[in-house]
Amino acid sequence: MTPTLARFLDQHGFARDQLSATGPDGRFTPLMRACKEGRLDIVEELLTLGADLSVLNSDGCNALWLACYHGSHAIIQRLIDAGIALDNQNGNGATALMYVASNSKPDLVKLLLENGANPALRNFDDFSALDLAASLECLKLLKKAA
């Protein structure tokens, strides 16, 4: 473990010997926090050390959702390459693709679709990413993929 990772873990209240455990509030694992903050260096080291990609936070989201929140293409692609569940549905049935479409992030819609995200999935309110698209660009990308 590098000193940089050790500082990151300490700063956010994570145990150094439980790299896949959620912190005291149950909202983030170290990997999720690093994704949310756009820390590719920390993401890389955590993956190298075996951080579990299947862990979900209290909302049912995996680290991909937090990477999409930040918007780092490099982190999103790294998680996908490492085998993260691209179509994980959270506690509301929403996927990362639905999130980026509803937040008008067409570059991320394109990235997720190119990597195999399923645009046909529906959340628990029966909406798809296409239904939730918040911009014309997102709408066009999703219609083309449908």
Predicted regions: what is each one?
Residues 16-19, 53, 86, 119:
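Ankyrin-repeat inter-repeat connecting loop/turn
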Residues 1-37, 44, 48, 146:
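Intrinsically disordered, low-complexity regulatory segments in ankyrin-centric signaling systems
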Residues 26-27, 60, 93, 126:
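Start-of-repeat signature of ankyrin repeats
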Residues 1-12, 115, 124-146:
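Ankyrin-repeat-protein effector appendages
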Residues 23-24, 57, 90, 123:
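Ankyrin repeat boundary/linker residues
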